[in-house]
């Protein structure tokens, strides 16, 4: 879902046709989004895959 929105935003950036102020604004918004995603504040952080109960591979003989 996030990847889809990112691709849409990239499409919009390609269509913008080089207006400097809007490009800078877009880049600032992207940077803020990344800070929110990987910084201390994660409102929509997904559930961690680990720790999970570790199940070693046991072949069926």
Curated annotation (Swiss-Prot):
Keyword Ribosomal protein found: no
Descriptive protein name: Statherin
Region Disordered, annotated ranges: 37-61
Organism the protein comes from: Macaca fascicularis (Crab-eating macaque)
Signal peptide stretch: 1-19
GO BP of this protein: biomineral tissue development; defense response to bacterium; regulation of bone mineralization
Reported tissue expression: Secreted by parotid and submandibular glands.
InterPro entries, A to Z: Histatin/statherin, Statherin
Gene symbol of the encoding locus: STATH
């Amino acid at each position: 879902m996030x990847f889809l929105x990112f691709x849409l935003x990239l499409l919009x950036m390609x269509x913008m046709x080089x207006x400097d102020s809007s490009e800078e604004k877009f880049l600032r918004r992207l940077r803020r989004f990344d800070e929110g995603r990987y910084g201390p504040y994660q409102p929509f952080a997904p559930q961690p895959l680990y720790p999970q109960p570790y199940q070693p591979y046991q072949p069926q003989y």
